[in-house]
């Protein structure tokens, strides 16, 4: 069923939408009704889910009951993004609003035509509508309300055709690639800063932080296994047990402890040497730049 689809939205999509909203709000502070932002969602389809990995805003206007969309700009952006990322295709559109309005029907009809023409499928693919309430007018005061919908046509039994359309809500989840997770963890560190800034750590500091996190998680897993096997304080979970077995299987390489210790030391020594050479090169470039500009 189409209503069982899950919409996985990546962090960059939310950042692009919020950035577009802030820019449009500043540029149209004197124009009433111009604070909304609309754009195209890029991504790909998977079994039971839609991955939304990128997006871009398009110029549009809905003042004075006139709905205008810059189709040429939209088509050019879709073509450019498909050249840079061939795996991505238009999968829907977004609108910064608290609820579905009557204008959404016209916008959706436009995107049905655009996405159907750009799709290689014979049938029209599922086209998702993502609404983002940037005014926080919903019940969630600390989280920005985000909803996804899929339009379906409805009609009276025995009628010649459908007479209305229904936007069915879909499940929305936050998904991220490994690189995006690293960036999000770095951004979260700025939440405790007054200036809302996060500094990049050096190579050795990042290695130290990652090692400390790994040790912390290993201690948590060890305590969990001890509580289940020896103390009996926690009931066993088959799913967690399988995940722990997968971790042990993936980490075991049938290597003797002496060889493993030598491999770790050599790898760390190589990493330190590369980091030292990078710092030395950076210092030489800075000195050369000062000598040239002097």
UniProtKB/Swiss-Prot annotation:
Compartmental location: Cytoplasm
Classification via CDD domains: MPN_eIF3f
Gene Ontology cellular component annotations, sorted alphabetically: eukaryotic 43S preinitiation complex; eukaryotic 48S preinitiation complex; eukaryotic translation initiation factor 3 complex, eIF3m
Keywords assigned by UniProt, alphabetized: Cytoplasm, Initiation factor, Protein biosynthesis
GO terms, biological process: formation of cytoplasmic translation initiation complex; translation; translational initiation
Gene Ontology molecular function terms on file: metallopeptidase activity; translation initiation factor activity; translation initiation factor binding
Primary subcellular site in the record, as a coarse category: cytoplasm
Domain MPN residues, every copy: 7-155
Phenotype upon loss of function: Extended lifespan in adults.
Family matches, as Pfam families: JAB, MitMem_reg
Highest taxon, organism lineage: Eukaryota
Subunit structure: Component of the eukaryotic translation initiation factor 3 (eIF-3) complex.
Annotated function: Component of the eukaryotic translation initiation factor 3 (eIF-3) complex, which is involved in protein synthesis of a specialized repertoire of mRNAs and, together with other initiation factors, stimulates binding of mRNA and methionyl-tRNAi to the 40S ribosome. The eIF-3 complex specifically targets and initiates translation of a subset of mRNAs involved in cell proliferation.
Family: Belongs to the eIF-3 subunit F family.
Protein name, per record: Eukaryotic translation initiation factor 3 subunit F
Species this protein is from: Caenorhabditis elegans
